[in-house]
Amino acid sequence: MPTEGVIDIVCNLFTEEEVRLGRTGVDEHFLDQVRFPRELRNGVSVEVYLEKMDRAGIQRSLLIAVRAGDLRVRHSFEIPYERVADICQKYPDRFSGLAGVDPTRGMQGLRDLTHAVREYGFVGAHLYPHWFEMAPDHARYYPIYTKCCELEIPIMMQVGHCLRYQKDRVLPSVGRPITLDRVAIDFPELTLIGIHVGYPWTEEMISVAWKHPNVYIGTDAYAPRHWQSPLVHFINTWGQDKVLFGTDWPVIDPERAVADVGELGLRPEPQQKLLRENALRIFRLPESNQE
């Protein structure tokens, strides 16, 4: 197993500032559900998280400037693009930005996405369909998909079910993996990444990724030791070019995740593709920190 050079394609800011300002989208009930350590619940500084990355062998993490729901609706939240851009600028060898997208913002949202890519150097877009209560194939997302094609960036989105992130606002699970089928047909130039492994419809996610050359799977939010056997087999054999490693920190600890991958019994080449090579290719990331 490689001890360095890993790329984590899904990482959330979970610092004291984000916790204090209510920019995490989760409450104590959710943190209890995922067994998040109590000593870390007030947030983890970027510097401390970099130490975690170092111990895990993670070279670079893709940091999400989240846009979670219509801000006119209670409990929706965002992390400003500028916040993520500042961190990426401070640590350009360790972080790259992902621009959260919000279909309720219309043309301004498209301008924001363009600015994030062209001015801040963000490498992709990120969508939370359940926060907008619209499936990935809803027409309101299509202008965003078009803009991603124009900017030549991939877009990742949560597929599968969603948990109860907050007791006071329960979101519907709108992201069945099969909904990416229509999007992939309508936008053959768009790179789509279904994150959260599509659970509990993981085999459905595998089938969509195998059908379409522009659809990929992100393995975040579920500890590798609990991945379903069809996914592990897909990664190790015929789907080795279609799957990318992620944590969804703070949901999954990066040290645990990388260690778990090493226990899956993957062959060296598929494992390297999962942990590094596929992400480098799809997000056009530099091969080393010196580039």
Indicate residue ranges for each PLM-predicted region.
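Short aromatic-enriched loop/helix-cap "lid" or pocket-rim segments at secondary-structure transitions
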Residues: 17-22, 75, 110, 167-170, ...
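Alpha-helical scaffolding within the catalytic cores
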Residues: 44-52, 79-85, 111, 177-180, ...
